[in-house]
Amino acid sequence: MKNIFNWLDSLKGRKELPIKSLPSQGIFYANDFKLWIKKVKVEDILEYEKLYTSDISVVLVLIKKIVQLYTTLPSKYTFDDIKSTDIIFIFLEIVRFTTNRAVKIDYYNDISGISESIELVPDNFNYFDVPKALKNTFNPETKEFIVDGYKFSVPSIG
């Protein structure tokens, strides 16, 4: 049955992004939370390129706009439910899905002394490992850590 849904999604120009592949690893989302990404329209790419700047606050606004326009969530969720730690990763997945090409970042390798590039994919991403002492404080129903009566979670966009 899942293959039929994947086929229908591909006809709609969208694909499901596994929540476990996100930087948050999905632990702060409700169990029924799902996320689909769509390919970006040419006019939005042109607008992004026209407005792109080295000002990080402008870049973040543009990234959030693209993510908001090109993600689909179940009806009981909104863009504001997406965790802020996942936004840039989702944006890069949208870029990869739209261009059908790898997203690579160039960097200088201090050990080898040469410039290299790395592909940004879940396999190359270092996920946060929750310390064992903190894992014991996690409430799976509320999706929060509870320490000394205080509740902690990663911030959402909203």
Each language-model region and where it sits:
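Short, surface-exposed, charged amphipathic helix/loop patches that serve as local interaction elements
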Residues: M1-G158
